Amino acid sequence: MEIKMVGMKPGERIEFSTIEKRPNLTLSDGGRIIVWPILALEVWNIDRAMARMVISPPQGEPMTPDHPNWSWHEYGMRVGFWRLKKMLEALSVRPTVTLNGRVCDDYPEVAGACLDAGWEFNAHSYEQLPMHKLDNERTVIDRSLDVIEKFCGKRPRGWFGPGLTQTFETLDHLSQAGIEYIGDWVLDDQPVWAQTTHKPVAALPYNYELHDIVMMNIQNNESHIYRDRAMDYFNTLYEESTDGHPRVIALAMHPYLSGSPHRIRYVRETFEKILSFPGVVCWDGEQILDWFAKQIPA
């Protein structure tokens, strides 16, 4: 049965805090930057409108089933994922894998490869449907966590909403279901605590600027822009981090975009360049959560 809640707006869940006037977070050995690599794995149901499009339908008419865009995403699971996996393993980068629970059912080889690699499993709902369009939000959350836990033997601690969507009640449902952190908010360079009707949930720093969907699918930038923008972004935060406030930089990847042949080079160069700097660590979401919670308890 769906639990009815009043809900809270984000500003009611978090305290306003400027980065210049808050307790310092510290990284060992003078660390300054945490890189948070995120690999999103999704299921696009061909019976519905596609989550994203690389090609618009003829005459602009809605198209269902949408074979062209469905197959574009399918390439990511058949080829792009494996290209990214080889790159990440060669660089000793262990990403947070945020996946629709249905990936475990529809693409068990892909999910199994992540499990064998020891990567963190983060819940991304059951399939790629926006949270604010669900009639049974809590039921879908529970199903997502249950399916992933059954597959990997561990319940996810973190969550990304499909398309970063939420309702005013989502965080309350997530906290009651055992979720400890979310990645849906892009409001800071450091983690923050968000209050819920149950236990506080940490909002880890995410961003749109270094998101492959935003850069490559919405803004239609050339492939090298991924690397160039990431380095500009990193250089600024690296310089600022001398103030005693380590920053978090999230790098979001989708196999059908970042795993394409003409982009993988620039994704690899981004990680190589950033990780070559002293004082930079590469952590998954659980590591960032534990680091933050130990120094600034909820």
What are these regions (language model features)?
Residues 2-202, 228-251, 257-298:
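Catalytic alpha-helical scaffold of carbohydrate-active enzymes acting on polysaccharides/glycoconjugates
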